UniProtKB/Swiss-Prot annotation:
It comes from Alteromonas mediterranea (strain DSM 17117 / CIP 110805 / LMG 28347 / Deep ecotype). The lineage of its organism: Bacteria, Pseudomonadati, Pseudomonadota, Gammaproteobacteria, Alteromonadales. GO terms for molecular function: D-tyrosyl-tRNA(Tyr) deacylase activity; Gly-tRNA(Ala) deacylase activity; Ser(Gly)-tRNA(Ala) hydrolase activity; tRNA binding. Belongs to the DTD family. The keyword Hydrolase applies. This is D-aminoacyl-tRNA deacylase.
């Protein structure tokens, strides 16, 4: 499971011209699901994101987590994160989960975040989405669990 996490002052996702998910201050999570991902990866990444200190304290140091700043999370599926880009001029997706498995893991991941008390908005799995964001910093982290 791969998560590309961006600290944002706002973010939204649009499908067919309609905003279907939006947040204020918080994190945008672009989530790529691999074939072998399951409950262990879901819990590991969800726990990491809830505890990760990527928000600035009063001294400007990254010492606060999402809960401490009252932030929100926008989760958007992005299968291209699992692409193999090592060979040739075209990405390979053999590591990626099937659409059925990917959607199930995506939904379980969102549920895991909500079960931890996080305010979560989402995109639409498998849809052609337009993602808008204001990256705060910019601050971006790559997690591979």
């Amino acid at each position: 499971m791969i998560g590309l996490i961006q600290r944002v002052s706002e973010a939204n996702v649009t499908v067919a011209g309609e905003v279907i998910g939006e947040i204020g201050k918080g994190m945008l999570v672009l989530l790529g699901v691999e074939k072998e991902d399951g409950d262990a990866e879901i819990e590991k990444l969800a726990n990491k994101l809830c505890r990760y200190r990527m928000f600035s304290d009063e001294d400007g140091k990254m010492n606060l987590n999402i809960e401490q700043v009252g932030g929100e999370i926008l989760v958007v599926s992005q299968f291209t994160l699992v692409a193999d880009t090592q060979k040739g001029n075209r990405p390979g997706f053999s590591r990626g989960a099937t659409p059925e498995h990917g959607e199930a893991i995506y939904k379980k991941f969102v549920h895991a975040l909500r079960a931890k008390g996080m305010a979560v908005s989402t995109g639409e799995f498998g849809a052609d989405m337009q993602v808008g964001l204001v990256n705060d910093g910019p601050v971006t982290f790559h997690f591979n669990v």
